[in-house]
Structure formats: C-alpha cells, structure tokens
A protein has these predicted regions:
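Boundary/junction segments of secreted and surface-exposed precursor proteins
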Residues: 1-17, 25
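Short beta-strand-centered aromatic/proline hotspots
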Residues: 18-23, 106, 149-166
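Conserved, function-critical positions that sit in or immediately flank catalytic
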Residues: 24-29, 33, 37-137, 147
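Short, solvent-exposed secondary-structure boundary/capping segments
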Residues: 28-30, 69-70, 115-117, 158-174
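Short solvent-exposed strand/turn elements
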Residues: 35, 164-186
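Extended low-complexity, serine/threonine- and proline-enriched intrinsically disordered segments
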Residues: 43-49, 87, 135-145, 203-222
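Short, low-complexity cationic-aromatic patches
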Residues: 77, 124, 200-221, 242-254
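Charged, amphipathic alpha-helical scaffolding segments
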Residues: 224-261
Length: 261
C-alpha cells in the first residue's frame, strides 16, 4: 500500500471567541454577555453541555420545492437541551417572502438524544435537498492571546452556561497557560465522519473491507501506538471493534495521522 503522513488543522469557524474570567483546576469561567433581547440583562454565553456532545445528524426530504420532513441519521448523545437546527437556504427564487423562503425545524430531545426533528416551515425554492446542520459535537478550546502558549488547545470535556471543563490528561497547570482575561476561541472538532465523509457518495476515501478499504491510522492518546480505521460502506470501523460505529472518533488538530491506500 501507499502511505502518506498528514494532519488536520482546527476548523476555521469559531463557535465562540472571548475572554476568560478565572481558572480553577481544569475549569475556565467566562464573563456573561448582554442579552440580545434585553441588553440590560446579563446572559450566559454558552448552551449547557453543547460543546461536549456527540453531534446528531439528519437528512431533509424535499417535495415540490418544500422541505417536507427531516429524517434522523444519527441521534447523537449528551444533549441537555434541544439543539438548534440549521437548514441551508433555498437555491432558487428571488423573494425571501414569496418563492425563496427558508425552511425552519425544531428538535426534540429525550434521554440526551435527538429523538425527533419537526418541520414547522417547509420553505419554498428548494430544487435540491438542503444540508441540515444540528448544533453540538465535540469542541476544542484554544488560546489565541499573544503569549508563549498561544495556540495551545484542549478538548472540552463538559460545559455549563458560563464555564467549560477541559480534558487535561497530562495534568498540566492550566493557571500558567490561561491567565485572567486571556482571549480564547472555541471551535468544533473534526471527526472521522466530518473530515472524510459519513457514507458514500460523500466519502473522500475508498470503502471496502479490512483488506480492500483505504485506512486511517490515528495516534492513541498519550501513546506512540496508532489505531487503524476504515469505512465498510455503511460506517467507519475501528480494527478490533468492527461492530461499533467509529464515525464520531475525534481527529486531533495538528497531530500526524497516516493514510494508507
């Protein structure tokens, strides 16, 4: 096989950019923000738990230019509240009130999973099936302050409305990395599915069985060992655990991994 060593950077779009108030152990506390509806009222900057979920996925169905329903492909997990559903805008029409109307949907959560997505406005002007984006998924927090530690990042383990808890597997002293009022960004993490595609025809690598499919070798946490993954045409699989769907395996930024084909 042909091998190539590559890496994936952080996603470019930031879910949040702001300053921290304080650090305690692995917990970073943030300032409240003016509420959008009432600027005199302080509001928390985050939705509780949303930065540490397994993101749900869904596909829209379109009939006669309208989004008629949304089918859940994966329920996700870890949701404390219903996530926001974003449906991409229509591709035809000229008037946003007549023939180019955005579709709107809302999610229901039960047992920390997205169990239903209800279309409350089908929209108009959809000649194709629009992409449905569901809020959530794993996130990284990165220091963007001009500092010797600039660029350091950590996976978010959990979050409340104004606090995040970082995964600190090396037991670093975060007080020395994140100082009061330091500027940070929170960005979505890549997963095998979001980086290489969840299923055909969107896959960027060849699917197949353990011997015929392209492989992705990801480094194990705090180890020099690499674990092999491949797509079998249905889902991503991890060698040694073929019954499990590995599509939501996190791909760490700026860490080398190996592609074999």
């Amino acid at each position: 096989p042909f091998y190539k060593v590559v890496s994936a950077g952080l996603k470019s779009e930031a879910a949040f950019r702001g300053q921290i108030v304080s650090v305690s152990d692995n917990n970073l506390t943030f300032y409240t923000l003016p509420d959008l509806l009432d600027p005199t009222y302080p509001a928390f900057p985050f939705v509780s738990g949303m930065f540490a979920t397994t993101r749900a996925r869904a596909t829209a169905k379109v009939i006669d230019g309208n989004v008629t329903s949304i089918v859940i492909d994966s329920n996700g997990s870890g949701y404390l509240k219903p996530p926001e559903i974003r449906i991409h805008p229509p591709d035809s029409g000229t008037d946003a009130t007549i023939d180019a109307v955005d579709a709107i949907a809302v999610a229901e959560v039960n047992g920390s999973k997205v169990t239903a997505i209800n279309v409350i406005e089908g929209g108009r002007g959809y000649s194709y099936v629009p992409y449905v984006e569901i809020e959530g998924g794993p996130h990284f927090l990165r220091l963007v302050e001009e500092d010797p530690n600039e660029g350091r990042f950590f996976l978010i383990e959990s979050n409340s409305g104004n606090q995040v808890t970082l995964l600190n597997s090396l037991n670093l002293d975060l007080d020395t990395i994140f100082k009061p009022d330091a500027l940070v960004e929170i960005t979505p993490a890549w997963t095998l599915g979001s980086l290489f595609g969840y299923k055909p025809p969107m896959l960027k690598l060849k699917d197949g069985n353990e011997t015929t499919a392209d492989r992705v070798y990801l480094g194990e946490t705090n180890s020099t060992n690499y674990q092999a993954y491949f797509h079998d045409g249905t889902a991503w699989r991890r060698e040694g655990a073929l019954a499990e769907d590995a599509s939501d395996t996190i791909v760490y930024p700026d860490e080398a991994f190996i592609l074999a084909r």
